[in-house]
A protein has these predicted regions:
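Membrane-water interface signatures at transmembrane helix termini and the short loops
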Residues: 223-284
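Aromatic- and kink-enriched transmembrane "portal" helix at the membrane-lumen/periplasm boundary
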Residues: 34-35, 72-91
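Membrane-interface transmembrane helices that cradle and orient dolichyl/undecaprenyl
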Residues: 100-115
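Perimembrane helix-loop-helix junctions
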Residues: 137-162
């Protein structure tokens, strides 16, 4: 006997989920834009990042059935966490990280894919121009190449280094032209600045609320995937295991350097969105339907709280 579809199942399989989510998100952005000036550049980056998530889902078949939950989850979480206090730096870093994922999986099981590796890590290099601390992810990304994309070799290792450095060739020219070599030196000094570890003096209630909710989604999505991933192809499992590893790394880095919670939070959302989308798409039953509805209500309430209630520094 066919099981009756729940609200969760209908949303997950609907072709209208992404258009409706995009419309609602746009209305929220426009409403906030009437109150807060200069948010449209960030809105444009969020829209482009969402399109990249659509492409990431399509190209890598993240869902073994039709579903737009990856891009819907990403857009909903970015709208919730980003408004009304937007960060252009965070928006750019987030888009670059998605672009990295989109490119690096072309290297799957190909240890001679120096070209794709170069382009993927050039995206990380671009992100590091404005957020040098993303360099802390480099060892983890190399582990990813060894264990998950199975593309690590001496050639691809050096290709990743060259890709990371290339944006600085152009940036160095700019700093020389403007006679601001000290600015370039200060940029790299931030990479080894450990004086602000565990500095929670500027963390706000909004940031803690957003992080707690996204972490909850990460845990739910990760546990569900680990328990039920046997139905997926090996390549798909590798991709999701990468999401789990990078989510854990992002949370650890946020705990260590909470002053970078916006930039790291964007990276966390990129990795969490597919995990919770997998949960929404492939779970059945009344309990998971109720869980989905509760998570949806929590997201709306947190979004309303972020927009309507002024931020408060906790310490």
């Amino acid at each position: 006997m066919l099981r009756k579809k729940t609200f969760q199942n209908k949303v997950a399989a609907s072709r209208y989920s992404l258009p409706i989510t995009a419309t609602l998100a746009t209305l929220v952005w426009v409403a906030v834009g009437l109150l807060v000036s200069n948010i449209w550049v960030e809105f444009a980056f969020t829209a482009m990042s969402t399109l990249l998530m659509v492409e990431l889902n399509n190209r890598n078949a993240l869902m073994r059935t039709y579903s737009r939950m990856v891009s819907c989850s990403f857009l909903a979480l970015m709208t919730m966490a980003g408004l009304p206090h937007l960060s252009l730096k965070s928006s750019i870093v987030t888009m670059c990280f998605i672009a990295f994922y989109l490119i690096i999986w072309n290297c799957y099981q190909d240890k001679r894919s120096t070209g794709w590796t170069f382009y993927a890590f050039a995206c990380i290099g671009l992100a590091s121009l404005i957020f040098v601390q993303i360099g802390y992810f480099m060892p983890i990304l190399w582990i990813m190449m060894m264990v998950f994309t199975l593309s690590f070799s001496v050639k691809t290792f050096f290709a990743s280094l060259v890709g990371l450095i290339v944006p600085y060739w152009f940036a160095a020219g700019y700093f020389f032209y403007t006679d601001n070599i000290q600015g370039l030196a200060d940029h790299f000094c931030e990479f080894i600045n450990y004086s602000e570890l565990f500095d929670y003096s500027q963390v706000t209630d909004h940031q803690i609320l957003n992080l707690s909710f996204v972490t909850l989604l990460t845990i739910i999505g990760s546990i569900h995937f680990i328990r039920t991933s046997y139905g997926d192809k090996i390549r798909t499992r590798m991709i999701y295991e990468t999401f789990i590893m990078l989510s854990a790394a992002s949370i650890i880095f946020i705990i260590l350097q909470p002053q970078h919670i916006q930039e790291l939070g964007g990276i966390l959302i990129v990795n969490t969105a597919p995990l919770i989308a997998y949960f929404i798409t492939f779970t059945r039953g009344k309990f998971t339907n109720i869980t989905f509805i509760l998570l949806l209500i929590m997201l709306v309430l947190i979004m309303a709280y972020n927009i309507l209630v002024p931020e408060t520094i906790l310490l």
